[in-house]
Amino acid sequence: MTPQALAERSREMDGLSFIRALLEGELPPPPIAQLLGFRPVEAAPGRAVFELVPGEQHYNPIGSVHGGVAATLLDSAMGCAVQTTLPAGTGYTTLELKVNFVRGLTAQSGPVRCEGEVVHRGRTVATAEGRIWEQDTGKLVAHATTTCLILAPR
């Protein structure tokens, strides 16, 4: 399925059904998830959870996972949490993303879990929070907030 066809399917389904279809493998992962290697593991109204195993392919020049990987993971989890609240035909886009990094990641960190949760969902704007934890230690890696614009059907 092409990325454009996947986007079209997302508009045909309500957001929760779409995220669950990704989670259950009924739809292919979006290109960014394939590129970075993260996957959805939970979805509920107002909530989305992803997992990633950090590897050397994610490294920056100083030998740790690039902050953009964590930021992308957080943006994805929080955005998908917002998406789970949307009816068919309604989309969203990130207006603002604020990430706080509290510890670095390396390939030795082991798998991480990223949870996104909606704080507020209005008619035109939604806000959400996200956190990344090391699965093995439970240590917080980063936390974030986002503001998303709700895109009404055309």
Question: Whereabouts are the PLM-identified features?
Answer:
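Terminal targeting signals and extreme-terminal segments of soluble enzymes
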Residues: 1-154
